[in-house]
Amino acid sequence: MKENYQKQLDALLSTLPPEEKPRLLLQSCCGPCSSYVLEYLTRYFRVTVLYYNPNIQPRAEYNRRLYWQQELIRRLPTPEPVALLACDYDGQRYIDAVRGLEREPEGGARCTVCFRLRLEETARQARAHGFDYFGTTLTVSPHKDAQRLNAIGAELAQQYGVRWLPSDFKKREGYKRSIELSKQYGLYRQEYCGCLYSKPVDNGRTEE
């Protein structure tokens, strides 16, 4: 039976002390996916966005998404400022991690490796910088498996000694709200997840 991670999040949020918000390191893939999540979670946490996405190719695309992540943080009204921790681009790390899985279908084994790569760096950074929780915006997407993401996150929480924030942000029309906010703030919405293997193909040729 599938876990209801939205209910788990609801239960966790109900226990948080209102007088002092805990610190959350939130891995984000892009501005659009983080829009609803930041609107939601900044009521309960002091949030730092971690932009760590070595899967995004090419580098120009990585920088473009980073720019719009910064713009969203600058424009979105939140109870208190949202910080941004942007990692240096390291596309080779992703290429090495998924070697041999290049032809896997979208949503398959390659994506599992990618999820773990990004979430493990988030857990590592969370421990290094003394965050109370770590989490990800990825569960807002209807194309991302919340069961898999949360299982990986919970495992890494045990390994790194930092609490995992369970989530399924697509619930309660979270994805719909992210589209509304993206339009409201004029955010760039990409047409593929990030790696070149997931890029749309037209007439046998990958889009430039």
What do these predicted ranges mean?
Residues 1-208:
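Nucleotide-activated chemistry modules centered on ATP-dependent adenylation/adenylyltransferase
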